[in-house]
Design a protein with these regions (language model features):
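Outer-membrane beta-barrel translocator/receptor signature
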Residues: 209-216, 223-273, 299-302
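Short acidic/polar hinge/loop motifs at secondary-structure boundaries
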Residues: 72, 153-155, 179-206
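N-terminal periplasmic accessory domains that precede
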Residues: 102-107, 117, 147-150, 184, ...
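Face-selective signature of the C-terminal outer-membrane beta-barrel domain
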Residues: 301-329, 351-492, 498-501, 508, ...
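Extracytoplasmic beta-strand/coil segments of soluble accessory domains associated
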Residues: 148-181
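Outer-membrane beta-barrel signature, preferentially recognizing the C-terminal barrel domain
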Residues: 494, 511-513, 523-572, 579, ...
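Short, acidic, small-residue-rich periplasmic hinge/interaction motif at the N-terminus
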Residues: 35, 46-50, 84-88, 102-140, ...
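Short, acidic Ser/Thr/Gly-rich low-complexity loop/linker segments typical of extracellular
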Residues: 53-68
């Protein structure tokens, strides 16, 4: 009994001391927890304290991942507490704040919608100086099979084959609770575990110079003393095609351990490679027409990862990942060749095979420390090693006689280090930051031509600020310096320094619309693959090589966008312009009586773009979503006395329907032409239809068909802007046409939810060091 009395006395003492602390300095605190009718916490509810009786706002906040809020205001005054969240009735209460108050649980009742009351994206977004924060309702989360597919809730984001990109084709950087992550990691997280999504349409300064279209940070509910098991499989039943992931994570105290395995594979037997080739050497024409036959193509890409995280909210975060990734790819082709000359026409048989494989271990260490909620230090170190091999053989046969033969055999040892450090100071309405990134690469190769070695060093240092000016203007400004040093096997060293400013200014017109102006200067750094010579012949007088004399290019980008969210409709037009000085692009030159395909620094590349994104929910309860993205672009290239241009466009309509446990998605993308230097790539059009069903909570089964009514998947590359050579290569994979597949997603979690913490950086080396064919 005495122990019970002591325990009660301790509890009462702590309770009274807490109230005493709340009441200090003339300020009292209001706390509470917002839940729905089934007692689930409501995350991101708006909690505002208004002055009584004029209703001027005193302070405000949003509920955390546990639905808890905390407001502080002067005591001995009367206020109005106003709580709101999309899909629920607004809660108001008059409060006489004489002392600190615990409101306990506040239950919000669902709102009875009429058609005109449905408000979608516009009012589900909190806007900050550098991002937009999206919160999905439970009904919206049920429309998606995984956290990865839920990213399609965001404007201009598309998810295909367990990968995510912007609709204009740019890459997306994925963070999970700020931790550098991948689409694979998201594919095994249940959408019900999403607390919010931070959407950076203009990548923060630490992610600049990566060619990204956006950065997305998915904040989840984590588990305390429990774990998560996730499975996401996508496999075709008509051909060899699969993307499969399994994951297990276990939480104990402030720590988490995880294991992930991912395997993607392709196994086709109907790949066809056609080619048309023509060039002149000493006024003699070399012309060939190659008609491909059905040939095999296969690869297996595997990744195993173990991870450990230890974090204490508002204090520190430590994260480490050790992963091993491997690739084994094989492809071959057989072609009927017609070779034309002034004297005769010769029929040949062409045979090619290429094999490439690599093993890539990566160690990623991350640490973030906060001091007094104002100061933050972030450190990130990534070490990568590549052991890769590439073998290519090609020959043309005249009967049993080899008329032409070429081969390349490259073995590469490459290791790299990326180190990042950043300090930030959080002020009332702004954040100041300073940081530096160091990147080191050492690439050693053995090939038929002999050994090769390249070493690169790059340092990028920056300082900047982000914040708000008043209630309507947000800004993000930084200045940086990029310094590059290259060293070759012959001890030749090249050094380059560039100034890199970045400015983003936005104006919030009203609660549902804004306009954004972005300007930045980036450095286009040549990759190890571009710098390595590695010659091989594609024809007797046509050779393909890297360029050790490349220097970095400088790219100026400016864009202006407008966003408007009506009750059921979103419109987002954007115009952009870029100017790349000394741009690194594929070019063709004449050298040593050969036509050489390589990479070069041309005078400039100008790109002009205009795009329009539309989204419409025409019916109640978001039953149907219609989307349309369209863009048009024009490019001008200048290289010496030559100038060439190209204009292209793309249109992407999509339809998504959701009714109870069923879902239907239809997608189409027109053919798209992309010009890079003197090579034009014609990406194929794409279409798919998917029907999904959720038999159990956190389980989704999807049946789909890819490229319906197509005869093949087709990719074409051709020369453009040069009179030295004319070459058109068309790759077709018949196996992909009318491909039927099944997708099974299941997530099981156990444990109690608690808030998460954020990381700020991500680094990765994806360059294997081999010049692609």
């Amino acid at each position: 009994m005495s122990k019970i009395k002591n325990l009660l006395f301790t509890i009462v003492s702590v309770f009274l001391c807490s109230f005493n602390a709340w009441g200090q300095n003339g300020v009292s605190t209001i706390i509470g927890k917002i839940v729905d009718v089934v007692n689930e916490p409501i995350i991101g509810a708006q909690c505002v304290l208004l002055n009584h009786p004029d209703s001027t706002q005193i302070t405000g906040t949003t509920t955390n991942v546990d639905g808890v809020f905390e407001l502080k205001a002067s005591k001995d005054k009367e206020y109005i507490l106003h709580i709101s969240f999309i899909g629920f009735e607004t809660y108001t209460s008059n409060i006489a704040l004489n002392e600190s108050i615990d409101m306990g649980k506040i239950t919000l009742s669902p709102k009875a919608y009429t058609l005109d009351d449905v408000v979608i994206t516009a009012q589900m977004v909190d806007r900050f100086s550098d991002k937009k924060e999206y919160k999905l309702t439970n009904a919206e989360k049920e429309q998606y099979s995984s956290a990865l597919s839920a990213l399609e809730f965001l404007p201009k984001i598309q998810v295909i084959d367990q990968s995510v990109s912007s609709v204009d084709g740019k890459g997306i950087k994925i963070l999970i609770n700020g931790v550098p992550s991948t689409a694979t990691d998201l594919s095994i997280i249940s959408p019900s575990n999403i607390a919010k999504i931070d959407y950076y349409t203009q990548p923060p300064v630490q992610y600049s110079n990566m060619g990204l279209g956006a950065v997305i940070n998915v904040v989840t509910k984590t588990n305390e003393n429990g774990g998560i098991i996730g499975l996401n499989t996508q496999n075709a039943i008509t051909t060899g095609f699969g993307n499969n992931t399994v994951n297990f994570k276990y939480n104990f105290g402030n720590s988490q351990v995880g294991v992930t395995y991912n395997v993607n594979y392709r196994n086709y037997n109907k790949r066809i490679l056609d080619e048309s080739l023509q060039y002149f050497i000493d006024d003699e024409e070399y012309r060939k027409e190659k008609t491909g036959k059905e040939s095999p193509y296969a690869y297996e890409e595997q990744m195993a990862e173990i991870s450990f995280n230890n974090a204490k909210a508002d204090n520190y975060v430590f994260s480490s990942k050790l992963s091993l990734k491997s690739l084994n790819r094989r492809r071959s082709s057989v072609q009927d060749i017609m070779m034309y000359s002034a004297e005769e026409t010769t029929q040949l048989i062409g045979e090619s095979s290429d094999k490439d494989k690599y093993i890539r271990p990566v160690l990623d260490m991350y640490f973030n420390k906060s001091f007094n909620k104002k100061h933050e230090i972030t450190l990130n170190a990534v070490g990568t090693y590549y052991d890769s091999d590439y073998k290519y053989n090609y020959r043309e046969l005249l009967g049993d006689i080899t008329d032409f033969e070429t081969a390349t055999d490259i073995s590469t040892d490459k290791y790299s280090f990326i180190g990042d450090a950043m300090y930030s100071l959080n002020l009332k309405s702004s954040q100041l930051f300073v940081g530096t990134r160091y990147m080191y690469n050492n690439n050693r190769q053995k090939n038929i031509a002999g050994p090769n070695s390249i070493e690169t060093n790059e340092v990028y240092s920056y300082v900047g600020a982000t914040g708000m000016i008043g209630q309507n203007v947000n800004y993000n400004v930084s200045v940086g310096v990029n310094h590059n040093v290259f060293a070759t096997l012959d001890n030749e060293r090249y050094s380059f320094t560039y100034f890199r400013p970045q400015l983003s200014v936005g104006y919030f017109i009203d609660e549902t619309s804004d306009v954004m102006l972005n300007y930045e200067v980036n450095t286009q750094t040549p990759s190890i693959s571009n710098l390595t010579y590695n010659p091989y012949y594609k024809d007797p007088h046509y050779v393909y090589v890297g360029n050790p004399d490349l220097k970095p290019g400088n790219i100026h980008n400016v864009s202006l966008s407008y966003y408007k969210g009506f009750k059921k409709f979103v419109i987002n037009p954007e115009i952009g312009y870029s100017y790349a000085n000394d741009a690194i692009v594929p070019i063709f030159i004449r050298s040593n009586n050969n036509i050489t395909e390589t990479f070069g620094n041309i005078d400039y590349v100008q790109n002009m773009t205009a795009s329009l994104f539309l989204q419409w929910y025409p019916f109640d309860n978001n039953l149907l979503r219609l989307r349309l993205f369209a863009d048009v672009y024009h490019q001008i290239n200048k290289y010496g006395e030559m100038q060439w241009e190209h204009t292209g466009y793309s249109i992407i309509p999509s339809i998504m329907m959701s009714y109870k446990k069923w879902g239907l998605q239809l997608y189409y993308q027109t053919q798209k032409e992309t010009l890079s230097g003197q090579m034009l790539k014609v990406s194929p059009s794409m279409a798919y239809a998917e029907l999904s069903y959720r038999p159990l909570k956190n389980m989704t089964i999807t049946a789909g068909i890819r490229y319906p009514f197509y005869d093949a998947w087709k990719l074409t590359t051709e020369t453009h802007g040069t009179n030295l050579i004319s070459r058109v290569e068309t790759e077709r994979i018949i196996n992909n046409a009318n491909m039927v597949y099944l997708n099974f997603v299941y997530n099981f979690s156990f444990g109690k939810n608690k808030p998460n913490v954020k990381l700020k950086m991500s680094n990765e080396d994806k360059d294997a060091g081999i010049l692609g064919r």
